[in-house]
């Protein structure tokens, strides 16, 4: 393969660029004579900062603009935080590669006056910042004595708001903090028993044209099979529930002895109703595991909970 040029579409946020530059570096290191360039842009989710993500109600908030660049031939691939990539992609595009996963857990970040507390010991009335309905519902279920407020902006902006005293603590993805060099600000990794993470959290998804065999061959070098198996199960679970990135659906997955165990959760917005179950299956059929787990939760009332949430979104 000689003198092949590859263009990446990326969000222009600092975290997105760190992730995209990592992909660029890995590809150029492993494939001789490959020239990789980056087209950075703002997405709808980057531009609308004064409205809670759930109220915007669009499943492609952080991806549509990047996908448009590929569909018109201006980019060959798009690098996404996999948790932001909808489970149903536009015609002509596919998820071509899933990279090795960073820690998928949520993390507690506190300001100096609260560094003696863990999430479970925060005083009544403490103000917790999060933009995620998934985190909000689970934490309301566990800690109804805390006050939860929406927080928008990139990771750095959110930490600045925390340190300025607007919040006592904030919840962020551990992976993003580590990739941006803020690992020292992680006060607590939140156990999955308290908060299941988002579908695909911690992994990068590389999207490309479905029929571009050369590009698929190039990006396959970054594929991590165990991560891919786990994330495909998680995404099948979300797809079967017809949920999106902004609804209270959480997961956890692990692989042991050629078996994949997937735990899933659906909760009401107030956290009062929370359904959780798990399904174990053949590691080589991850999507079936996700579908079966979704069926289990539907039988326990997940569809009713999600229907109520979607109805509230429509009213707004």
UniProtKB/Swiss-Prot annotation:
A Pfam family of this chain: Porphobil_deam
Pathway the protein takes part in: Porphyrin-containing compound metabolism; protoporphyrin-IX biosynthesis; coproporphyrinogen-III from 5-aminolevulinate: step 2/4; Porphyrin-containing compound metabolism; chlorophyll biosynthesis
Comment on bound cofactor: Binds 1 dipyrromethane group covalently.
A GO term, aspect molecular function: hydroxymethylbilane synthase activity
Keyword annotations of the record: Chlorophyll biosynthesis, Porphyrin biosynthesis, Transferase
Cofactors, names only: dipyrromethane
Catalytic reaction annotation: 4 porphobilinogen + H2O = hydroxymethylbilane + 4 NH4(+)
PROSITE patterns: PORPHOBILINOGEN_DEAM
Enzyme class: transferase
Gene3D superfamilies from the UniProt entry: Periplasmic binding protein-like II, Porphobilinogen deaminase, C-terminal domain
One cellular-component annotation, GO: cytoplasm
Functional summary from the UniProt entry: Tetrapolymerization of the monopyrrole PBG into the hydroxymethylbilane pre-uroporphyrinogen in several discrete steps.
Note: The porphobilinogen subunits are added to the dipyrromethane group.
Protein name: Porphobilinogen deaminase
Organism this protein belongs to: Prochlorococcus marinus (strain MIT 9301)
């Amino acid at each position: 393969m000689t003198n092949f040029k590859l263009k990446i579409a990326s969000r222009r946020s600092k975290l997105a660029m760190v992730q995209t530059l990592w992909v660029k570096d890995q590809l150029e290191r492993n494939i001789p004579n490959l020239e990789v360039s980056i087209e950075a842009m703002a997405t709808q989710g980057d531009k609308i900062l004064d409205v809670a993500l759930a109220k915007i109600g669009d499943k492609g908030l952080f991806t549509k603009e990047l996908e448009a660049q590929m569909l018109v031939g201006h980019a060959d691939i798009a690098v996404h935080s996999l948790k932001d990539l909808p489970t149903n992609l536009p015609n002509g595009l596919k998820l071509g590669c899933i990279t090795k996963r960073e820690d998928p857990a949520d993390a507690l970040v506190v300001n100096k006056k609260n560094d003696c507390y863990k999430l479970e010991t925060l005083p009544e009335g403490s103000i917790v910042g999060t933009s995620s309905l998934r985190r909000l519902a689970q934490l309301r279920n566990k800690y109804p004595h805390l006050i939860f407020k929406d927080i928008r902006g990139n990771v750095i902006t959110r930490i600045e708001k925390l340190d300025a005293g607007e919040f006592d603590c904030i919840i962020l993805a551990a992976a993003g903090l580590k990739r941006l060099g803020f690992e020292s600000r992680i006060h607590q990794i939140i156990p999955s028993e308290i908060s299941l993470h988002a579908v695909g959290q911690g992994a990068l998804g590389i999207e490309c044209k479905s029929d571009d065999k050369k590009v698929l061959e190039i990006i396959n070098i970054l594929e991590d099979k165990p991560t891919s198996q786990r994330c495909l199960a998680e995404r099948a679970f979300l797809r079967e529930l017809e949920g999106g990135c902004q609804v209270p659906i959480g997961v956890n997955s692990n692989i042991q002895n050629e078996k994949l165990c997937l735990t899933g959760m659906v909760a009401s917005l107030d956290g009062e109703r929370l359904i959780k179950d798990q399904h174990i299956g053949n590691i080589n059929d991850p999507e079936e595991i996700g579908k079966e787990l979704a069926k289990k939760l539907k039988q326990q009332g997940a569809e009713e909970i999600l229907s109520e949430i979607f109805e509230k979104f429509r009213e707004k």
